[in-house]
Every structure is written in C-alpha cells, then in structure tokens.
C-alpha cells in the first residue's frame, strides 16, 4: 500500500514503452515458454502457467492441474536466483492454495537454477547475439533486494557471517540460498563461458527503493564507467527469464 501510489503513474508510462501488439511481453513470452516446455516434456506431463499479479492466476493454474487429477505437482518459480521475497513467497502462495484441497498430491519444488547448465547455456546463446568485442565493459544487472533480507537469510544458518562482500565469492552450504551469492555465481559462470576477462565486468543490482539495498547499484556503476571513458557498455539481465518492465 506504500509503493503503489508513488509508482503507478511512472510505471504506466514505462509499460506503454514495452507493450507489444500481442500484449504484455511478460505474459506473451511466459506463455511461449509454457508451450515449448509442454512440447519438450510430451503428453506425460501437464504444464500450466500461473502468475502472482496478473492472469492466468496461480489459483487458476493449480485448479486445472486438480481437474487433471495429477499425481505430482512440480512447482517451478521462474526466478533463477533464490530469494525469500520472490521464490519463497511464490511457493508459499501455491501451498496456501494446495492446503485447501481435499487430497493433496506429492509436491516437488525447484527452488533455484542459477547455475543449471541449461540456464547458463540459454544466457550464453542470448549473449552471442552481440559482438562482445565491440564493447568496453559488461554489466550483469540483477534485481536488487534490501540488505536486511540478505542478513536474515544468513541468520537462518545460525552463523551470521554475511558481510555483503567476499562471503559471496564461493557457493557453500551456508550461502547456497543467499540471493546475492547466487547472482555472483551466475556472473562467474557466464564470464567464464563468454571469455570476459577480469576487470572488464561487474555484478550490479537495480530497482532499489532506498540506500539500504544491496550494492553496487547498476545505474551508479554505468554512470561511473561513462565518467571513466567507457562509451559502449553491454548490460545483461540474468535474473529475468522473460522480458518485463525490469
């Protein structure tokens, strides 16, 4: 109730810029993914798309699976990097619907895929649409989160060792569900595959609402690089599997 009144007008203008003849690019591309996955998996599976804040709703998608009398439901939140505010809340919303069913089938949750070979391959294929040699610098921009979210995740493991720094340099059992660590690992895998040398790229975070969000900030890094004389900066967005307002 606090964010919407201040952002609605600006968001409406931005949506007009990305809207397509087919409609919302997020819905259009997500539907295409659903169709492609159904084709890949075949008739043994039923693939449905459910969305939190637009149609088709999560409840509608699950209701269709209920009518199919499926024996197992695989929930795949389309967030490569795990965060309680995105992946976690989506799973929670799905489970609240499922708990009302008379009979609940087996439920499997795919909570993250930030380092899955198929996901990395897809990002690399997308990047190769560009001549990487033409650019001075590369920015891997992920959606930001409040710092307190990251710290709470660290506290879950009882260590409270998160320093919002070098602790994200390597994935371990104590940070495998840390959003920031997931993002840095995605970047490491991509730059390795794309042969981008050290010093030519940076992992950044966008869409902050205040100065207590995880750093570095995408817009500030791009401004700094421009001041340093970089004239062609290529920005990747590995946190989003479908085009959207972000």
Locate predicted features:
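Active-site-proximal alpha-helix that buttresses catalytic centers in soluble enzyme cores
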Residues: 1-246
């Amino acid at each position: 109730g606090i964010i919407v009144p201040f952002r609605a007008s600006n968001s409406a203008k931005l949506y007009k810029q990305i809207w397509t003849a087919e409609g919302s690019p997020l819905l259009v591309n997500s539907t295409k993914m659903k169709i492609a996955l159904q084709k890949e998996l075949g008739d043994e599976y039923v693939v449905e798309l459910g969305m939190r804040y637009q149609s088709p709703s999560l409840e509608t998608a699950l209701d269709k699976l209920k009518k199919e009398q499926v024996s197992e439901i695989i929930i795949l939140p389309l967030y490569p990097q795990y965060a309680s505010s995105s992946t976690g809340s989506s799973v929670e919303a799905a489970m609240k619907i499922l708990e009302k069913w008379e009979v609940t089938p087996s439920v499997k949750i795919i909570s993250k895929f930030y380092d899955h070979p198929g996901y990395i391959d897809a990002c690399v294929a997308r990047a190769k649409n560009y001549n990487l040699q033409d650019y001075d610098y590369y920015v891997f921009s992920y959606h930001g989160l409040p710092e307190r979210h990251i710290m709470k995740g660290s506290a879950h493991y009882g260590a409270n060792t998160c320093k919002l720094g070098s602790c994200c340099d390597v994935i371990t059992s104590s940070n495998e569900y840390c959003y920031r660590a997931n993002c840095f690992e995605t970047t490491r895998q991509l730059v390795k595959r794309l042969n981008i040398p050290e010093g030519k790229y940076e992992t950044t975070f966008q869409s902050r609402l205040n100065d207590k969000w995880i750093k570095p900030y995408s817009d500030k890094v791009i401004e700094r690089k421009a001041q340093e004389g970089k004239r062609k900066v290529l920005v990747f967005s590995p946190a989003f599997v479908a085009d959207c307002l972000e």
